Amino acid sequence: MFYDDDADLTIIQGRKVGVIGYGSQGHAHSLSLRDSGVQVKVGLKEGSKSRAKVSEQGLDVDTPAAVAKWADVIMLLAPDTAQADIFKNDIEPNLSDGDALFFGHGLNIHFGLIKPPAEVTVAMVAPKGPGHLVRRQFVDGKGVPCLIAVDQDPTGKGEALALSYAKAIGGTRAGVIKTTFKDETETDLFGEQAVLCGGTEELVKAGFDVMVESGYPPEMAYFEVLHELKLIVDLMYEGGIARMNYSVSDTAEFGGYLSGPRVIDAGTKDRMREILRDIQNGDFVKKLVANVEGGNKQLEQLRKENVEHPIEVVGKRLRDLMSWVDRPITETA
Protein backbone atom coordinates (compact mmCIF):
# COMPACT_ATOMS: atom_id res chain seq x y z
CA MET A 1 0.00 0.00 0.00
CA PHE A 2 1.30 3.46 -0.92
CA TYR A 3 0.50 6.74 0.83
CA ASP A 4 1.38 10.43 0.45
CA ASP A 5 4.98 10.01 1.58
CA ASP A 6 5.54 7.35 -1.10
CA ALA A 7 4.60 9.64 -4.00
CA ASP A 8 6.37 12.68 -5.45
CA LEU A 9 3.81 15.24 -6.62
CA THR A 10 6.44 17.23 -8.52
CA ILE A 11 6.71 14.45 -11.12
CA ILE A 12 3.20 15.00 -12.48
CA GLN A 13 3.49 18.74 -11.90
CA GLY A 14 6.33 18.69 -14.41
CA ARG A 15 4.19 17.06 -17.10
CA LYS A 16 1.31 18.22 -19.30
CA VAL A 17 -1.79 16.10 -18.74
CA GLY A 18 -4.55 15.69 -21.29
CA VAL A 19 -7.76 14.15 -19.95
CA ILE A 20 -9.90 12.66 -22.71
CA GLY A 21 -13.53 12.66 -21.60
CA TYR A 22 -15.41 14.70 -19.02
CA GLY A 23 -17.84 12.27 -17.46
CA SER A 24 -17.94 11.06 -13.87
CA GLN A 25 -14.20 10.38 -13.58
CA GLY A 26 -13.04 12.89 -16.19
CA HIS A 27 -14.30 15.94 -14.35
CA ALA A 28 -12.95 14.71 -10.99
CA HIS A 29 -9.48 13.99 -12.40
CA SER A 30 -9.27 17.25 -14.35
CA LEU A 31 -10.33 19.56 -11.53
CA SER A 32 -8.23 17.83 -8.89
CA LEU A 33 -5.15 17.74 -11.12
CA ARG A 34 -5.54 21.47 -11.72
CA ASP A 35 -5.95 22.14 -8.01
CA SER A 36 -2.75 20.14 -7.41
CA GLY A 37 -0.77 22.47 -9.65
CA VAL A 38 -0.75 20.30 -12.76
CA GLN A 39 -1.11 21.66 -16.31
CA VAL A 40 -4.36 20.17 -17.64
CA LYS A 41 -6.38 20.26 -20.82
CA VAL A 42 -9.60 18.37 -21.51
CA GLY A 43 -10.18 16.63 -24.83
CA LEU A 44 -13.74 16.59 -26.17
CA LYS A 45 -15.04 16.33 -29.72
CA GLU A 46 -16.46 19.38 -31.45
CA GLY A 47 -20.10 19.85 -30.52
CA SER A 48 -19.87 18.01 -27.20
CA LYS A 49 -22.40 19.35 -24.70
CA SER A 50 -19.75 19.08 -21.97
CA ARG A 51 -17.49 21.69 -23.59
CA ALA A 52 -19.39 24.60 -22.03
CA LYS A 53 -19.20 22.97 -18.60
CA VAL A 54 -15.44 22.50 -18.91
CA SER A 55 -14.96 26.16 -19.79
CA GLU A 56 -17.28 27.31 -16.99
CA GLN A 57 -15.15 25.37 -14.51
CA GLY A 58 -12.03 27.18 -15.67
CA LEU A 59 -10.38 24.42 -17.67
CA ASP A 60 -8.99 24.54 -21.19
CA VAL A 61 -10.78 22.34 -23.72
CA ASP A 62 -9.85 21.28 -27.24
CA THR A 63 -10.36 18.32 -29.56
CA PRO A 64 -8.96 14.95 -28.42
CA ALA A 65 -6.37 15.09 -31.21
CA ALA A 66 -5.17 18.58 -30.28
CA VAL A 67 -5.00 17.68 -26.60
CA ALA A 68 -3.09 14.47 -27.36
CA LYS A 69 -0.57 16.44 -29.40
CA TRP A 70 -0.11 19.00 -26.60
CA ALA A 71 0.08 16.56 -23.68
CA ASP A 72 2.83 14.17 -22.67
CA VAL A 73 0.55 12.28 -20.27
CA ILE A 74 -2.81 11.31 -21.75
CA MET A 75 -5.52 9.93 -19.45
CA LEU A 76 -8.18 8.18 -21.54
CA LEU A 77 -11.46 8.32 -19.61
CA ALA A 78 -13.94 8.03 -22.47
CA PRO A 79 -16.38 5.07 -22.35
CA ASP A 80 -14.69 1.68 -22.83
CA THR A 81 -16.47 1.07 -26.13
CA ALA A 82 -15.30 4.39 -27.59
CA GLN A 83 -11.66 4.22 -26.52
CA ALA A 84 -10.24 2.13 -29.36
CA ASP A 85 -11.54 4.51 -32.04
CA ILE A 86 -10.37 7.58 -30.10
CA PHE A 87 -6.94 6.03 -29.71
CA LYS A 88 -6.67 5.10 -33.40
CA ASN A 89 -7.98 8.38 -34.81
CA ASP A 90 -6.91 11.02 -32.29
CA ILE A 91 -4.23 9.77 -29.92
CA GLU A 92 -1.93 7.35 -31.75
CA PRO A 93 -1.03 9.80 -34.57
CA ASN A 94 0.00 12.35 -31.95
CA LEU A 95 2.08 10.18 -29.62
CA SER A 96 5.79 10.83 -29.18
CA ASP A 97 8.55 8.78 -27.58
CA GLY A 98 8.47 9.34 -23.83
CA ASP A 99 4.75 10.05 -23.67
CA ALA A 100 2.55 8.20 -21.20
CA LEU A 101 -0.90 6.78 -21.88
CA PHE A 102 -3.02 6.31 -18.76
CA PHE A 103 -6.32 4.52 -18.24
CA GLY A 104 -8.95 4.39 -15.51
CA HIS A 105 -9.85 0.79 -16.42
CA GLY A 106 -7.76 -1.90 -18.05
CA LEU A 107 -10.17 -3.50 -20.52
CA ASN A 108 -8.85 -2.10 -23.79
CA ILE A 109 -5.20 -2.77 -22.96
CA HIS A 110 -5.67 -6.19 -21.39
CA PHE A 111 -7.73 -7.55 -24.28
CA GLY A 112 -5.56 -5.95 -26.96
CA LEU A 113 -8.16 -3.55 -28.36
CA ILE A 114 -5.58 -0.77 -27.96
CA LYS A 115 -1.91 -1.48 -28.73
CA PRO A 116 0.29 1.54 -27.92
CA PRO A 117 3.80 1.89 -29.37
CA ALA A 118 6.54 0.27 -27.29
CA GLU A 119 8.15 3.66 -26.62
CA VAL A 120 5.09 4.88 -24.68
CA THR A 121 4.53 4.28 -20.97
CA VAL A 122 1.18 2.56 -20.35
CA ALA A 123 -0.26 2.77 -16.85
CA MET A 124 -3.53 2.80 -14.96
CA VAL A 125 -4.82 4.93 -12.10
CA ALA A 126 -8.25 3.71 -11.04
CA PRO A 127 -10.06 5.29 -8.08
CA LYS A 128 -12.36 2.79 -6.35
CA GLY A 129 -15.31 5.14 -6.25
CA PRO A 130 -17.47 7.28 -8.53
CA GLY A 131 -16.15 10.60 -9.79
CA HIS A 132 -18.33 12.80 -7.61
CA LEU A 133 -16.98 11.02 -4.52
CA VAL A 134 -13.37 11.30 -5.75
CA ARG A 135 -13.81 15.03 -6.21
CA ARG A 136 -15.68 15.63 -2.96
CA GLN A 137 -13.10 13.75 -0.92
CA PHE A 138 -10.29 15.67 -2.59
CA VAL A 139 -11.92 19.03 -1.84
CA ASP A 140 -12.42 17.93 1.78
CA GLY A 141 -8.72 17.12 2.12
CA LYS A 142 -9.30 13.37 1.99
CA GLY A 143 -9.17 10.80 -0.78
CA VAL A 144 -10.59 7.66 -2.35
CA PRO A 145 -8.36 4.55 -2.52
CA CYS A 146 -6.86 3.92 -5.96
CA LEU A 147 -5.42 1.04 -7.90
CA ILE A 148 -2.33 1.57 -10.03
CA ALA A 149 -0.76 -0.70 -12.62
CA VAL A 150 1.98 -0.39 -15.22
CA ASP A 151 1.75 -2.40 -18.45
CA GLN A 152 4.61 -0.83 -20.46
CA ASP A 153 7.53 0.93 -18.83
CA PRO A 154 10.21 1.89 -21.36
CA THR A 155 11.70 4.55 -19.05
CA GLY A 156 11.54 2.55 -15.82
CA LYS A 157 9.68 5.46 -14.22
CA GLY A 158 6.09 4.39 -14.89
CA GLU A 159 5.21 3.45 -11.32
CA ALA A 160 6.53 6.73 -9.91
CA LEU A 161 4.53 8.64 -12.53
CA ALA A 162 1.35 6.70 -11.75
CA LEU A 163 1.81 7.28 -8.01
CA SER A 164 2.36 10.98 -8.61
CA TYR A 165 -0.83 11.15 -10.66
CA ALA A 166 -2.73 9.26 -7.96
CA LYS A 167 -1.45 11.72 -5.37
CA ALA A 168 -2.66 14.64 -7.48
CA ILE A 169 -6.24 13.35 -7.36
CA GLY A 170 -6.12 12.49 -3.65
CA GLY A 171 -5.60 8.75 -3.91
CA THR A 172 -2.50 8.51 -1.72
CA ARG A 173 -4.35 10.23 1.13
CA ALA A 174 -6.47 7.09 1.44
CA GLY A 175 -4.07 4.49 0.07
CA VAL A 176 -2.96 3.15 -3.31
CA ILE A 177 -2.80 -0.55 -4.15
CA LYS A 178 -0.51 -1.91 -6.86
CA THR A 179 -2.14 -4.39 -9.22
CA THR A 180 -2.02 -5.49 -12.87
CA PHE A 181 -4.18 -4.62 -15.87
CA LYS A 182 -5.25 -8.28 -15.97
CA ASP A 183 -6.39 -8.48 -12.37
CA GLU A 184 -8.15 -5.10 -12.38
CA THR A 185 -10.00 -5.83 -15.60
CA GLU A 186 -11.11 -9.37 -14.86
CA THR A 187 -12.18 -8.71 -11.27
CA ASP A 188 -14.03 -5.54 -12.26
CA LEU A 189 -15.96 -7.27 -15.04
CA PHE A 190 -16.75 -10.28 -12.88
CA GLY A 191 -18.01 -8.15 -10.01
CA GLU A 192 -20.25 -6.17 -12.35
CA GLN A 193 -21.69 -9.18 -14.13
CA ALA A 194 -22.02 -11.82 -11.45
CA VAL A 195 -22.87 -9.70 -8.41
CA LEU A 196 -23.23 -5.93 -8.60
CA CYS A 197 -25.26 -5.44 -11.77
CA GLY A 198 -26.27 -8.73 -13.36
CA GLY A 199 -26.55 -10.90 -10.28
CA THR A 200 -28.27 -8.39 -8.01
CA GLU A 201 -30.68 -7.23 -10.72
CA GLU A 202 -31.81 -10.74 -11.56
CA LEU A 203 -32.12 -11.70 -7.89
CA VAL A 204 -34.37 -8.69 -7.24
CA LYS A 205 -36.53 -9.33 -10.31
CA ALA A 206 -36.86 -13.03 -9.49
CA GLY A 207 -37.94 -12.25 -5.92
CA PHE A 208 -40.47 -9.72 -7.20
CA ASP A 209 -41.86 -12.18 -9.75
CA VAL A 210 -42.25 -14.99 -7.21
CA MET A 211 -44.15 -12.76 -4.78
CA VAL A 212 -46.48 -11.31 -7.42
CA GLU A 213 -47.09 -14.73 -9.00
CA SER A 214 -47.98 -15.99 -5.51
CA GLY A 215 -50.71 -13.39 -5.20
CA TYR A 216 -49.03 -10.62 -3.20
CA PRO A 217 -49.55 -6.98 -4.22
CA PRO A 218 -46.74 -5.73 -6.49
CA GLU A 219 -46.32 -2.68 -4.25
CA MET A 220 -45.47 -4.89 -1.27
CA ALA A 221 -43.16 -7.01 -3.40
CA TYR A 222 -41.32 -3.88 -4.56
CA PHE A 223 -40.75 -2.65 -1.02
CA GLU A 224 -39.52 -6.03 0.22
CA VAL A 225 -37.07 -6.94 -2.54
CA LEU A 226 -35.90 -3.61 -3.97
CA HIS A 227 -36.62 -0.61 -1.76
CA GLU A 228 -35.24 -2.21 1.40
CA LEU A 229 -32.16 -3.50 -0.41
CA LYS A 230 -30.47 -0.13 0.11
CA LEU A 231 -30.82 -0.46 3.89
CA ILE A 232 -29.05 -3.82 3.84
CA VAL A 233 -26.32 -2.78 1.41
CA ASP A 234 -25.60 0.39 3.41
CA LEU A 235 -25.04 -1.72 6.55
CA MET A 236 -22.70 -4.07 4.67
CA TYR A 237 -20.88 -1.09 3.13
CA GLU A 238 -20.33 0.47 6.56
CA GLY A 239 -19.26 -2.60 8.51
CA GLY A 240 -19.27 -5.75 6.43
CA ILE A 241 -21.66 -8.69 6.43
CA ALA A 242 -21.26 -9.22 10.18
CA ARG A 243 -22.38 -5.64 10.85
CA MET A 244 -25.46 -6.18 8.72
CA ASN A 245 -26.41 -9.36 10.56
CA TYR A 246 -25.82 -7.66 13.91
CA SER A 247 -28.13 -4.81 12.91
CA VAL A 248 -31.11 -6.74 11.57
CA SER A 249 -33.59 -8.68 13.70
CA ASP A 250 -32.80 -12.19 14.94
CA THR A 251 -35.65 -13.43 12.75
CA ALA A 252 -34.11 -11.89 9.64
CA GLU A 253 -30.62 -13.11 10.53
CA PHE A 254 -31.75 -16.68 11.28
CA GLY A 255 -33.89 -16.86 8.16
CA GLY A 256 -31.05 -15.52 6.06
CA TYR A 257 -28.65 -18.19 7.31
CA LEU A 258 -31.16 -20.94 6.50
CA SER A 259 -32.51 -19.73 3.18
CA GLY A 260 -29.61 -17.83 1.62
CA PRO A 261 -27.69 -21.02 0.70
CA ARG A 262 -30.86 -22.40 -0.91
CA VAL A 263 -30.88 -19.45 -3.32
CA ILE A 264 -27.13 -19.15 -3.87
CA ASP A 265 -25.91 -22.74 -3.91
CA ALA A 266 -23.07 -24.76 -5.42
CA GLY A 267 -24.75 -24.57 -8.82
CA THR A 268 -24.74 -20.79 -8.64
CA LYS A 269 -21.01 -20.80 -7.93
CA ASP A 270 -20.45 -23.13 -10.89
CA ARG A 271 -22.27 -20.69 -13.16
CA MET A 272 -20.25 -17.83 -11.68
CA ARG A 273 -17.10 -19.73 -12.63
CA GLU A 274 -18.45 -20.02 -16.19
CA ILE A 275 -18.96 -16.24 -16.26
CA LEU A 276 -15.40 -15.73 -15.03
CA ARG A 277 -14.06 -18.07 -17.72
CA ASP A 278 -15.96 -16.14 -20.40
CA ILE A 279 -14.29 -12.98 -19.15
CA GLN A 280 -10.83 -14.50 -18.88
CA ASN A 281 -10.83 -16.11 -22.33
CA GLY A 282 -12.12 -12.98 -24.05
CA ASP A 283 -15.55 -14.30 -25.04
CA PHE A 284 -17.36 -11.48 -23.25
CA VAL A 285 -15.25 -8.79 -24.89
CA LYS A 286 -15.88 -10.35 -28.31
CA LYS A 287 -19.62 -10.02 -27.65
CA LEU A 288 -19.15 -6.46 -26.43
CA VAL A 289 -17.24 -5.49 -29.57
CA ALA A 290 -19.77 -7.25 -31.82
CA ASN A 291 -22.58 -5.32 -30.16
CA VAL A 292 -20.82 -2.00 -30.78
CA GLU A 293 -20.00 -2.91 -34.38
CA GLY A 294 -23.67 -3.85 -34.84
CA GLY A 295 -24.81 -0.40 -33.80
CA ASN A 296 -25.62 -1.34 -30.18
CA LYS A 297 -28.78 -3.13 -31.35
CA GLN A 298 -28.43 -5.98 -28.86
CA LEU A 299 -27.85 -3.57 -25.97
CA GLU A 300 -30.82 -1.43 -26.96
CA GLN A 301 -33.08 -4.49 -27.14
CA LEU A 302 -31.94 -5.69 -23.72
CA ARG A 303 -32.53 -2.23 -22.28
CA LYS A 304 -36.03 -2.14 -23.76
CA GLU A 305 -36.91 -5.52 -22.26
CA ASN A 306 -35.54 -4.46 -18.89
CA VAL A 307 -37.48 -1.21 -18.54
CA GLU A 308 -40.69 -3.02 -19.47
CA HIS A 309 -40.45 -5.37 -16.47
CA PRO A 310 -43.38 -4.81 -14.05
CA ILE A 311 -41.02 -3.89 -11.20
CA GLU A 312 -40.04 -0.78 -13.16
CA VAL A 313 -43.66 0.27 -13.62
CA VAL A 314 -44.66 -0.13 -9.97
CA GLY A 315 -41.33 1.28 -8.83
CA LYS A 316 -41.78 4.57 -10.65
CA ARG A 317 -45.27 4.93 -9.20
CA LEU A 318 -44.05 4.32 -5.65
CA ARG A 319 -41.03 6.59 -5.97
CA ASP A 320 -43.41 9.40 -6.91
CA LEU A 321 -44.61 9.18 -3.29
CA MET A 322 -41.11 9.40 -1.80
CA SER A 323 -40.12 13.05 -1.51
CA TRP A 324 -36.84 12.07 0.15
CA VAL A 325 -35.61 10.06 -2.83
CA ASP A 326 -33.46 11.93 -5.36
CA ARG A 327 -35.06 11.33 -8.75
CA PRO A 328 -32.99 10.88 -11.91
CA ILE A 329 -33.57 13.38 -14.70
CA THR A 330 -34.74 10.59 -17.01
CA GLU A 331 -37.53 9.71 -14.58
CA THR A 332 -38.70 13.22 -13.71
CA ALA A 333 -38.71 14.58 -17.26
UniProtKB/Swiss-Prot annotation:
GO cellular component: cytosol
Transmembrane segments: none
Cofactor: Mg(2+)
Residues the record lists as binding NADP(+): Y22, G23, S24, Q25, K45, S48, S50, D80, T81, A82, Q83, G131
Gene Ontology biological-process entries: isoleucine biosynthetic process; L-valine biosynthetic process
Positions annotated as active site in the UniProt record: H105
Keywords: Amino-acid biosynthesis, Branched-chain amino acid biosynthesis, Magnesium, Metal-binding, NADP, Oxidoreductase
Protein name: Ketol-acid reductoisomerase (NADP(+))
Gene symbol of the encoding locus: ilvC
Pathway(s) it belongs to: Amino-acid biosynthesis; L-isoleucine biosynthesis; L-isoleucine from 2-oxobutanoate: step 2/4; Amino-acid biosynthesis; L-valine biosynthesis; L-valine from pyruvate: step 2/4
UniProt-listed Gene3D superfamilies: 6.10.240.10, NAD(P)-binding Rossmann-like Domain (3.40.50.720)
Family statement drawn from the similarity comment of this UniProt entry: Belongs to the ketol-acid reductoisomerase family.
InterPro entries named in the record: 6-PGluconate_DH-like_C_sf (IPR008927), KARI (IPR013023), KARI_C (IPR000506), KARI_N (IPR013116), KARI_prok (IPR014359), NAD(P)-bd_dom_sf (IPR036291)
Residue ranges of every copy of the KARI C-terminal knotted domain listed in the record: 180-325
